[in-house]
Design a protein with these regions (language model features):
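Enriched for short, Lys/Arg-rich terminal
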Residues: 2, 11, 22, 37-38, ...
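Solvent-exposed, charged helical/coil patches
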Residues: 2-30
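A short, surface-exposed loop/turn module that caps and links secondary-structure elements
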Residues: 27-53
Length: 96
């Protein structure tokens, strides 16, 4: 499965200082790309899904699926910024 990243997602990921968190998030994304395994995820709103990483503050990656073969990573965050991250994800998706 092809996984694409928005500039907003890349900016968020690059700012993560916790190397273990980066590794865990990268591993989750890699499993989607190579094994079509999504792990702990759920729909949140309007075609946007939340991938939950159970580490640290509860990292979240918001994504949408286009067809059966493309996943677009919209933005990331954690449990404390969940609502604002969902709103940002909606805006990013609207502009894609």
């Amino acid at each position: 499965m092809l996984v694409k990243k928005t500039p907003e997602y890349v900016k968020w990921f690059d700012k993560l200082k916790d190397s273990k968190a980066r590794s865990k998030i990268y591993t989750c994304i890699d499993r989607i790309a190579t094994q079509n395994h999504f792990g702990d995820c759920k729909p949140v709103v309007d075609g946007i899904f939340e991938l939950r990483i159970h580490y640290g503050p509860g990292y979240r990656v918001y994504y949408t699926q286009r067809g059966e073969e493309i996943i677009l990573l919209l933005i990331g965050g954690d449990k404390s910024t969940q609502q604002s991250d969902i709103e940002k994800a909606k805006k990013i998706l609207a502009n894609q």
